[in-house]
């Protein structure tokens, strides 16, 4: 008799995706982040669902409802901080997942990579709208500043901004629609993640060497299920430690002050995971130019596969490219630091230099270095 998991219409989909899936025998812990992102998404949807039961998306009561969740709801404080810090964990896993893709040449699977870029945009949009919901000072002013960027679009800009606001400023209509979008987007993200996985399983996983691994495959279960469970346990350990010991470590104190349209905070800045893009935005004195640079700083990932000039897929055997990759990582960390600093000397010039280096490395320096490495190997 054939095994039920291989014949049942629903179970055979799960079987071919998570049980009998042929996987390369040499994939390292850098391949754990896909499953960790899935776990993060589940945590966010569940905690978000319970928060939505008590939250009210009205400018008069939003801040109070969040306070009520933390003070009066059973374990409300835990759910709220799991959700807030879960977002940080989500982005840590996202950045490491994308970094792995860049290092090992996973971007050569075009469909998988492009859906991944789309997922990154969707998660960033969701996180931005979620940050507005508590209706603190930084929520309100962050929403005002970021939505106002659309006014840089020629001709339709100002109309577009007012359309998104639902009025002449960030107000009740804005908060209500942001809550609606923040609720629906994670389910769209889950669907996109399914498509991401579908395309990945069409080709099979890449591996650290970047070579074809068809000759050496092992079943996903039990080898990688056990490995993924270890990763999940470490993720939960890190998240619970953060939530229980220092839940406000990554937040902004200004968000504990209710939103006040008449009082601007001294330094408006987004959550830490947007600081690198915010630094690129601020480093260009022109409004439209800044907005374009902001969008391109993420959209540039979609161009990376077309800039691959090396004869080898992975950076595993390319020391010069490895060096440049880690310079890029250091550059992004520098941009993250600059994004959180006030707009004054010397931070302005450091931000501008780091922004130029970011685009130069990806668009010019790394492709040229790959060609140089080809010549070194007489390829």
UniProtKB/Swiss-Prot annotation:
Enumerate the residues binding a ubiquinone.
201
* Presence of keyword Electron transport: yes
Tell me which CDD domains the record gives.
cytochrome_b_C, Cytochrome_b_N
**Lineage: superkingdom:** Eukaryota
InterPro entries per the UniProt record, alphabetical:
Cyt_b/b6_C (IPR005798), Cyt_b/b6_C_sf (IPR036150), Cyt_b/b6_N (IPR005797), Cytb/b6-like_sf (IPR027387), Cytochrome_b (IPR030689), Cytochrome_b_C_euk/bac (IPR048260), Cytochrome_b_N_euk/bac (IPR048259), Di-haem_cyt_TM (IPR016174)
Main location as per UniProt: mitochondrion
The record describes its membrane topology as:
Multi-pass membrane protein
GO BP: mitochondrial electron transport, ubiquinol to cytochrome c
Q: Cellular component GO terms, alphabetically?
A: mitochondrial inner membrane; respiratory chain complex III
Subunit structure, as described in the record: The cytochrome bc1 complex contains 11 subunits: 3 respiratory subunits (MT-CYB, CYC1 and UQCRFS1), 2 core proteins (UQCRC1 and UQCRC2) and 6 low-molecular weight proteins (UQCRH/QCR6, UQCRB/QCR7, UQCRQ/QCR8, UQCR10/QCR9, UQCR11/QCR10 and a cleavage product of UQCRFS1). This cytochrome bc1 complex then forms a dimer.
Protein name in UniProt: Cytochrome b
Lineage at the top is: Eukaryota, Metazoa, Chordata, Craniata, Vertebrata
């Amino acid at each position: 008799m054939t095994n039920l998991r291989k014949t049942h219409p629903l179970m055979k989909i799960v079987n071919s995706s998570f049980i009998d899936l042929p996987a390369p025998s040499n994939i390292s812990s850098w391949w754990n982040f896909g499953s960790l992102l899935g776990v993060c998404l589940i945590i966010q949807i569940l905690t978000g669902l319970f928060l939505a039961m008590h939250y009210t998306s009205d400018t008069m009561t939003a801040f109070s409802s969040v306070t009520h969740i933390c003070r009066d709801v059973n374990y409300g404080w835990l759910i709220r901080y799991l959700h807030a810090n879960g977002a940080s964990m989500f982005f840590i896993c996202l950045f490491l997942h994308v970094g792995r893709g860049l290092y090992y040449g996973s971007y050569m699977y075009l469909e998988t990579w492009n859906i991944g870029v789309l997922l990154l945009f969707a998660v960033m949009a969701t996180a931005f709208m979620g940050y507005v919901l508590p209706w603190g000072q930084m929520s309100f002013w962050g929403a005002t500043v970021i939505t106002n960027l659309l006014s840089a679009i020629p001709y339709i800009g100002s109309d577009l901004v007012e359309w998104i606001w639902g009025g002449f400023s960030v107000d009740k209509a804005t908060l209500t629609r942001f809550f609606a979008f923040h609720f629906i987007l994670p389910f769209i993200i889950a669907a996109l993640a399914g498509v991401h996985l579908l395309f990945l399983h069409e080709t099979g996983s890449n591996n650290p060497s970047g070579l074809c691994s068809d000759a050496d495959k092992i079943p996903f279960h039990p080898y990688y299920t056990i490995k993924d469970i270890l990763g999940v346990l470490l993720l939960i350990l890190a998240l619970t430690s953060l939530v229980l010991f220092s839940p406000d470590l990554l937040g902004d104190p200004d968000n504990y002050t209710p939103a006040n349209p008449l009082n601007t905070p001294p330094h408006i800045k987004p959550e830490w995971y947007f600081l690198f893009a915010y630094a690129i935005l601020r480093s260009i004195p022109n409004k439209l130019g800044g907005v374009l640079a902001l969008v391109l700083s993420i959209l540039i990932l979609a161009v990376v596969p077309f800039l691959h000039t090396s004869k080898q897929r992975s950076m595993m055997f390319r020391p010069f490219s490895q060096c440049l990759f880690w310079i890029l990582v250091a550059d992004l960390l520098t941009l993250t630091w600059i994004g959180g600093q006030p707009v004054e000397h010397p931070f302005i010039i450091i931000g501008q230099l780091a922004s130029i280096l970011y685009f130069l490395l990806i668009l010019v320096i790394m492709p040229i270095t790959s060609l140089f490495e080809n010549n070194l190997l007489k390829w």
